[in-house]
């Protein structure tokens, strides 16, 4: 298929810059978001994304449809619900979901859409808002290899490392492993910042020195400076990380993952402090405001 027209559903912190990068790479890009008032939606429109108010209009002519929304219920409703994407997408359109919804939900979506003459890839992303803006996301893809190969040029417009992980649901499985690391690394960065302040050492010194050695991590480089400055603007929201950690626990069938249990507890404490819509760097609040 010669892909020229793309629809992006969900023009939030991640979806908006992804749509903008598609425009920059020459794709005719239509965008849909439930609420048009969000600044991220306006930014997409200014960058050349044709923002529409109807799921039907957005989906009808798209060769590839990207979805980037909150959780598995949102994805299922958007795609399979009454008046959803599946009702209006053209035959054999390729739907690519970039949300984190878990392996089982992705497999069920793929199976259902195949019965309706549509194709599906689960393609969760990581790299945060910075990666979405810069087009350097890591994308973990599950689904038929032929669909992956067709989607690859499009995915290269929004990501840097794009990996076919296996059949439907495999991208989600790898993403859950990724989220274990993200949650625990954020805690490690927060504890390092907290300790540096208690010891009278500038957090910037710790970030610079430790970040270049074996203790370096994405969280230390990107989240720790925001922790130090109490800059909690999202990025990746606490409520979304908690959702992902729940999916991890469910996938593990509540098996022993004590690090995940700790991460859930600490991020829940931030949520109870009113921080559910703050970025994951707000984990430092669990230490400063406990």
Swiss-Prot record:
It comes from Synechocystis sp. (strain ATCC 27184 / PCC 6803 / Kazusa). Keywords: NAD, Oxidoreductase. The keyword Transmembrane helix does not apply. GO terms for biological process: organic acid catabolic process. Its EC number is 1.1.-.-. Pfam families: NAD_binding_11, NAD_binding_2. One of its GO terms (molecular function) is NADP binding. Belongs to the HIBADH-related family. NAD(+) binds at residues 7-21, 100, 243. The active site is at 175. PANTHER family: 3-HYDROXYISOBUTYRATE DEHYDROGENASE-LIKE 1, MITOCHONDRIAL-RELATED. This is Uncharacterized oxidoreductase slr0229.
């Amino acid at each position: 298929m010669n892909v020229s027209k793309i629809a992006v559903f969900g023009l939030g912190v991640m979806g908006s810059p992804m749509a903008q990068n598609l425009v920059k790479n020459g794709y005719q890009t239509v965008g849909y978001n439930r609420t048009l008032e969000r600044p991220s939606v306006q930014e997409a429109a200014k960058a050349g994304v044709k923002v529409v108010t109807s799921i039907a209009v957005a989906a009808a002519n798209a060769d590839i449809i990207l979805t980037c929304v909150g959780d598995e219920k949102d994805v299922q409703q958007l795609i399979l619900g009454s008046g959803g994407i599946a009702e209006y997408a053209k035959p054999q359109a390729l739907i690519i979901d970039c949300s984190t919804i878990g392996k089982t939900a992705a497999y069920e979506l793929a199976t259902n859409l195949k019965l309706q003459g549509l194709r599906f890839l689960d393609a969760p992303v990581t790299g945060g808002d910075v990666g979405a803006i810069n087009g350097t996301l890591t994308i973990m893809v599950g689904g038929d290899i032929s669909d992956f190969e067709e989607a690859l040029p499009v995915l290269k417009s929004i990501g840097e490392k794009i990996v076919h992980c296996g059949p439907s649901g495999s991208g989600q499985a790898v993403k859950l492993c990724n989220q274990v690391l993200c949650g625990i690394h954020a805690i490690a960065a927060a504890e390092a910042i907290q300790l540096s302040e208690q010891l009278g050492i500038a957090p910037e010194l710790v970030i610079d020195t430790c970040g270049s050695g074996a203790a370096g991590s994405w969280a230390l480089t990107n989240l720790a400076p925001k922790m130090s400055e109490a800059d909690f603007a999202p990025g990746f929201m606490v409520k979304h990380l908690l959702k992902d950690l729940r999916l991890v626990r469910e996938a593990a069938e509540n098996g022993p993952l004590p690090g995940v249990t700790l991460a859930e507890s600490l991020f829940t404490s931030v949520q109870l402090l009113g921080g559910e819509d703050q970025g994951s760097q707000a984990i430092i609040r669990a230490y400063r405001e406990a």
